C-alpha cells in the first residue's frame, strides 16, 4: 500500500500522515508490518513545512531589530525541524501503542546548507559538511530490545548507502547481498 502527500513546491504538512500510519498499525497483527514513511521534513521552502501554530516558535533572539534574510531563513528552518521532531515523536508514540514488538529507524536523506545563502538548501555540485552530516537514530520497544541482540552505537561513522544492510539486520533477513559488517547496528566496525 502506498500513500503520497508530497508536493515540494506547496504547503505539505507531514502530520497528515499520522492518522494513516495509526490506521495501518491498528490493523490485524496476523502478519508483521514494515512501514516506510518518507517525510518532507525540512525541504525548502521551509515555511511550507510547519503549521501556522508554529509561526511564532524560534523567533530570532534579535527580533527587536530588523532580521537579515539569513536569520529569517534559519528561523523558518528551525520551525520545520521542530515540526519534524513532533511528527517523529507521534510516529514513535503510535508504534509504541499499537505494535509492542517494534522498532523505528529514522534517517534524513540529506542535510541543508543554511550559512551560505549562495548554496542554500542542498546541492551535490556544491556540497558542504552540513549537507552530509545528518540525523540517524533507532528507537526500539522494550519487547524488541529484550528479544534482540542488536547493538546500536550512535557515534559510529556511517554512510546511508549501507542502509539496506542495517534494515536487513533489523528485519532478520539473510541473503547473499546482505553484508552485516556494513550494518550500523552490527557489533563489528563497518568496513567503509
Language model: regions and residue ranges:
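Catalytic domains that recognize anionic headgroups
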Residues: 2, 6-188, 192
Amino acid at each position: 500500500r502506498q500513500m503520497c502527500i508530497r508536493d515540494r513546491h506547496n504547503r505539505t504538512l507531514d502530520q497528515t500522515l499520522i492518522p494513516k500510519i495509526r490506521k495501518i498499525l491498528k490493523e490485524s497483527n496476523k502478519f508483521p508490518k514494515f512501514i516506510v514513511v518518507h517525510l518532507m521534513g525540512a525541504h525548502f521552502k521551509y515555511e511550507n513545512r510547519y503549521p501556522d501554530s508554529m509561526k511564532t516558535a524560534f523567533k530570532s533572539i534579535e527580533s527587536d531589530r530588523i532580521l537579515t534574510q539569513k536569520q529569517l531563513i534559519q528561523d523558518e528552518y528551525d520551525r520545520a525541524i521542530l515540526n519534524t521532531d513532533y511528527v517523529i515523536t507521534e510516529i514513535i508514540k503510535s508504534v509504541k501503542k499499537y505494535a509492542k514488538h517494534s522498532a523505528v529507524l529514522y534517517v534524513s536523506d540529506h542535510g541543508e546548507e543554511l550559512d551560505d545563502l549562495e548554496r542554500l538548501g542542498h546541492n551535490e555540485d556544491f556540497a558542504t559538511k552540513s549537507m552530509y552530516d545528518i540525523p540517524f537514530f533507532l528507537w526500539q520497544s522494550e519487547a524488541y530490545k529484550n528479544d534482540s541482540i542488536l547493538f546500536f552505537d550512535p557515534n559510529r561513522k556511517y554512510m546511508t548507502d549501507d542502509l539496506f544492510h542495517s534494515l536487513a539486520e533489523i528485519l532478520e533477513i539473510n541473503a547473499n547481498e546482505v553484508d552485516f559488517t556494513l550494518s550500523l547496528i552490527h557489533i563489528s566496525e563497518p568496513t567503509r
